[in-house]
């Protein structure tokens, strides 16, 4: 390749709207390549490139990075790379060796990065890490493949993706086959978002209650139900949210598809799919999810978990709702079943109060003060309300059409037959740590 020109004490090349300056440079006429060295600066109308060494082709207008390089645009975006190229004409770039892209709102890095600036598309391959800098809605997304759409403000992660939603000291870790996030305000233009009408929970049973065992069960066969008829089945409601009040344009929503696993210190869950919106702070779990809270396993067709101040506040389970808790180290299980279950959490994330409505059933293994079993309560009614203490049932209230009795622990009592419909103790698939959801243990 014939070298036609060299400068050693400063030079400048102007090509259309691109200006390149450096201390030294070599120009090769046959290939139309210019190699710039020392204090290299490329200036364009939309940004700058600073580096120590740069190859530039005057025909293709492709800049090739061969040393540590900093790229800045006029919108505040910064790219740091050590190897790659940028096509000025096509507005595309390929970057290698764990380049970093960041601005005031996020940072992202990966082994390889492909950027299409004209269409606002980017792909990050190999150990990609996205970090949001939003203090209120902060999250991290980690995967072997992340695709972003700047025009739509969306992110999709695949290939062992992990989402970390920052919730103070108790962050939520989520994995699935595919993770996706976007802006709520954009979603509302095209989709119906499932909403929940608040179902009132009568906590009057809690007033004046001390720690009592199940033998003090309150039987209120003729009392008025605390939840109106039909309110449970119709509690899940799809609402066209175009009529909602103005939505904060920064609010995010998250979706997870297939093999969803969730871990936090206070709660764990598995399911088929998930939707979470920053607008109402509700985790929606679909297709027979299972949720664990301390000693309790809760399952159903659909589960809605409400957060307040970034902590679990209440839980709604719709259709085939079942709560199970193992009695200490025994092979016995306390159970509550109904068409729906509503639960409240205390400040530590443990179930504090629970109601089961619609063909509600309850199995409870009563113990005395020395933890000796005294019998099994088997009851059913229209509505069952349960008080918990330290995550364990302490008092039960039955409302309307009460039926049941206390069975002996031995004799004719078949404990397997006492397991309610859909009973399945699934502690073996419960995520025990944030590492479990990644390794599949």
What do these predicted ranges mean?
Residues 1-441:
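Structural signature for solvent-exposed beta-strand/loop edge elements and short helix-capping sites
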């Amino acid at each position: 390749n014939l070298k036609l020109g060299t400068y050693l004490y400063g030079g400048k090349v102007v090509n259309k709207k691109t200006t390149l300056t450096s201390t030294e440079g070599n120009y090769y006429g046959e290939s139309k390549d210019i190699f710039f060295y020392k204090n290299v600066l490329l200036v364009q109308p939309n940004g700058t490139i600073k580096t120590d060494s740069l190859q530039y082709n005057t025909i293709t207008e492709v800049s090739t990075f061969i040393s540590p390089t900093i790229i800045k645009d006029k919108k505040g975006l910064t790219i740091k790379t050590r190897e790659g190229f940028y096509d000025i004409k096509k507005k595309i770039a390929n970057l290698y060796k764990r380049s970093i892209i960041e601005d005031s709102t996020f940072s992202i890095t990966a082994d390889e990065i492909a950027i299409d600036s004209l269409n606002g598309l980017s792909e990050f391959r190999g150990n990609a890490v996205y970090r949001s800098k939003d203090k209120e809605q902060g999250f991290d997304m980690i995967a072997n493949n992340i695709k972003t759409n700047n025009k739509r403000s969306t992110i999709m992660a695949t290939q062992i993706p992990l989402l970390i939603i920052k919730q103070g000291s108790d962050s939520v870790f989520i994995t699935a086959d595919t993770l996706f996030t976007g802006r709520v305000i954009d979603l509302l233009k095209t989709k119906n978002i499932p909403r929940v009408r608040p179902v009132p929970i009568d906590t009057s049973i809690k007033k004046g209650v001390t720690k009592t065992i199940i033998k003090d069960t309150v039987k209120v066969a003729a009392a008025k139900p605390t939840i109106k008829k039909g309110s449970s089945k119709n509690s899940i409601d799809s609402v066209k949210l175009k009529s909602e009040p103005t939505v904060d344009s920064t609010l995010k929503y998250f979706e997870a598809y297939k093999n969803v696993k969730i871990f936090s210190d206070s709660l764990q869950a598995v399911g088929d799919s998930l939707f979470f919106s920053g607008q109402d702070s509700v985790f929606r779990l679909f297709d027979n999810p299972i949720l664990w809270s301390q000693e309790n396993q809760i399952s159903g067709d659909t589960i809605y978990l409400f957060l307040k101040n970034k902590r679990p506040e209440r839980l709604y389970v719709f259709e085939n709702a079942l709560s199970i808790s193992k009695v200490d180290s025994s092979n016995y299980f306390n159970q509550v079943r109904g068409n729906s279950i509503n639960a409240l959490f205390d400040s530590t994330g443990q179930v504090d109060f629970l109601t089961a409505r619609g063909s509600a059933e309850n199995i409870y293994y009563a113990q005395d003060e020395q933890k000796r079993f005294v019998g099994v309560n088997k009851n059913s009614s229209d509505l069952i309300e349960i008080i918990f203490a330290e995550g364990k049932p302490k008092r039960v209230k039955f409302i309307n059409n009460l039926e049941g009795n206390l069975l002996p622990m031995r004799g004719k009592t078949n404990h397997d037959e006492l397991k309610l419909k859909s009973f399945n103790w699934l502690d073996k698939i419960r995520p025990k740590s944030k590492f479990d959801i990644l390794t599949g243990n």
